[in-house]
Amino acid sequence: MSVYTFHGWPKPDELAEKIGSDEQAEIIIIAQNWPESLTAQSPAGQIIVQLWVEARIFWQHQPVFSYPFRYAGKFILIQPHVYEQWVQFNPGIVCTSTTPVYSEFRYKPWLTLPDLLPIKSVVVIGAGIAGAATAFALAKRGIAVTVIEQHTIASAASGNHLGLLYAKISAHATVQTELLLAGYGYSRALLSNCLPTGQGWLDCGVIHLNYNSKEQQRNMLLANQNPQSKLFHAVTQEEASQIAGIDLPHSGLWWPYGAAINPLSWIQNMLRHPLIQVLTTTKVNAICRQKDLWQIDCKNQLEAFSLNASHIVICAGAESNFLYPVAGWPLHKIRGQTTTASIKQEAVQPHCALSANSYITPQWRDKLCFGATFHPNQTNDDLTSEDEKENWQQLRQWMPHLAANLDSDNPLQGHAAIRCDAYDHLPVVGPIGDTSAMFKYYAQLRMDKNYPLTQSCPWLPGAFINTAHGSRGLITAPLCAEAIAASILGLPSPLSVHLQQALHPNRLPIRMLTHHQSFAFAEQTK
């Protein structure tokens, strides 16, 4: 796991010679723009050029842009003005500067990263997209991982027949837009590396329709701001209909690299790694710190047993805040249900996925998938006729001709699950601090949220979380899994400091302090 840093773009042939056959190379390039042209003479250099050409499609001038490289490495392009700041928030990366670059980060020690801890073993709790991607990010770098799943693989929020991979972004610079753009290319490349096209996913593209004036304005702004973008471009109603192969009622924004993915196929592929052991139908009853290790008390259908690990990563979605050390943390639960249906034999199916106030995919394994419903604070994960009716009503409203061509006479078909979300609709990703200790150390924040505290964060050694991806897990969870692996292994983070802090788990308990709120966090049970 060697890190190669370049100030400016290296020549592809020279880079290929330098890294040789290193499958875990971490390549950092500090540069403001992409080179106008890329050429190489050697076969290895030409492969690097091809990768960079693919990656450039997804680059949108982000401060930190990451893209998978070879089997277990990555390529990171960093804007020069954020480089020193980014290095200082990356334990394990050599920092030549002794002066903090941005003083506004100094009084938020709870939003930093802990020092590295020697790895003895890793347990990941949850076998959805977040848990599988986290385990895979570690396993492909030689770390053995045990994944514990209370039910079966991809049975909760990752259990839809098909989900969409595309980025519904704002026309303005927001944290969520930065995250979605960062995750889009990363997920797309990782997916392509894991599964051949057609085996668990459709390389079909996505049209986001201008189904109301607000969406039309947003999509027009995006297209006008990025006229040369290969990532997306505006299409007229006629052009959209030609792409989709069916008559569409609106113009829209065409995302040619969007995809429709069967999450189970992708998750199973990642969990097949030989260094990953998966324990399904296994409930975690308790987690506690014993000497220098975490003890995870489990029970399956046959026996009760315990596992020990130097590192734990909680990826349990809506079940996450039932587990120490984040038990009682303020995470929101949102019920969602998708519907599947067959298309009538004489009808023409859409050639691409369509998105409006809901979505519909092309056919995969004889079923199209559409929805989904959105019901905050509901925790029933059974299929219901009410949600089925709602999905059909939405589809008939914005795509009446397509809805009429689907078979609606079958009994309930689809998937229902509980999504996990945070107050700001951003994932919760990173190392976990000791909640009770933070409440004591940072109590002054109750009186003044800007009080310049310098007390180091009381970290829980080796404890991490990757959850609260809502309905966007396919695009955000793999990138966040890479960020977790980087933190554990001391590798370069794929996230900017801005994103690291915006997603940091400790923002939740600290917000309780600054908003004069309390919640019943749990102490460890032993």
Where is each model-derived feature located?
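Dinucleotide-binding Rossmann-like beta1-alpha1 core, especially the glycine-rich loop
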Residues: 163-243
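C-terminal catalytic lobe of FAD-dependent flavoproteins
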Residues: 406-526
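Short beta-strand to alpha-helix junction loop
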Residues: 174-183, 211-216, 253-269, 382-387, ...
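Helical element adjacent to the flavin cofactor pocket in flavoenzyme catalytic cores
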Residues: 253-307, 311, 315, 320
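Hydrophobic Val/Ile/Leu positions in short beta-strands of Rossmann-like dinucleotide-binding domains
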Residues: 29, 124-125, 147
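Helix-loop-beta segment of a Rossmann-like dinucleotide-binding subdomain
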Residues: 171-172, 198-208, 234-273, 373-377, ...
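Active-site substrate-recognition segment that forms the wall
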Residues: 109-117, 123, 130-141, 150, ...
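The AdoMet/dcAdoMet-binding core of the Class I SAM-like
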Residues: 2-92, 97
